[in-house]
A protein has these predicted regions:
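Sec-dependent signal peptide recognition
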Residues: 2-8
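Long, low-complexity intrinsically disordered regions enriched in Ser/Thr, Asp/Glu, Pro/Gly
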Residues: 5, 18-20
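N-terminal signal peptide c-region/cleavage motif recognized by signal peptidases
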Residues: 13-14
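Primary mode marks residue(s) on the alpha4-beta5-alpha5 output face of response regulator receiver
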Residues: 21-195
Length: 195
């Protein structure tokens, strides 16, 4: 847990400064509204006692369980998540461009009950792409809707479809070190316009 808090503090410090060195603008949301947004990502049995972070890593509330709920990945706060410690470490590696040992991936779990930003199911780098225009190099851009996610070793994941429209669970980012199981709790919808 101590290692986790050090990571959170370093993440928080690094995210309070813009690329040009200026301070990031203040949030238009009250602290209680931000906590409510973050808690909406998971069931109350997890989020009530979780550590709550804003999108930039600011600690809004220290928790008493091993979960972290955040307001999302950007200032719009449209994709809050609740992550266990294994998923939090996975996410930090993903965002930092580090390697992940998918063959020996320990079990991890996360909730995104408000959904996520649309991504290409096949391409991890699509997280920051323009997801509303389908081009020749885009695959399954989709809105995953409310879902749970599980980290599992490749030997388990290779038995599961990667088609987000097949119905039921599917593997996101298949055949990459970042593949993980998506468990939708609502319909998965395409997220692009045909041009």
């Amino acid at each position: 847990m101590q290692k986790y808090l050090v990571l959170v503090v370093l993440f928080t410090i690094s995210n309070h400064i813009c690329a040009d060195g200026s301070a990031k603008p203040a949030s238009p949301y009250s602290k209680s509204a931000l906590i409510k947004i973050a808690m909406s990502a998971g069931p109350p049995s997890i989020s009530l006692d979780a550590t709550i972070l804003d999108y930039d890593g600011t600690i809004l509330r220290k928790g008493t369980n091993q979960w972290v709920c955040n307001t999302g990945g950007d200032p719009q706060r449209i994709n809050p998540a609740c992550l266990d410690e294994v998923w939090l470490a996975w996410n930090e590696r993903f965002m930092a461009g580090k390697k992940n040992d998918i063959e020996n991936q320990p079990f991890g779990q996360a909730y995104m009950l408000q959904g996520d930003v649309p991504v290409d199911n096949d391409v991890p780098a699509s997280y920051g792409m323009d997801d509303h225009v389908k081009g020749p190099n885009t695959g399954h851009f989709h809105d995953s809707g409310p879902h749970m996610m599980f980290l599992l070793p490749r030997a388990v994941l290779e038995q599961i479809t990667s088609d987000p429209y097949a119905g039921g669970s599917y593997v996101m980012f298949p055949n990459t070190e970042w593949e993980h199981l998506m468990v939708p709790v609502d319909d998965v919808k395409p997220s692009f316009e045909n041009h």
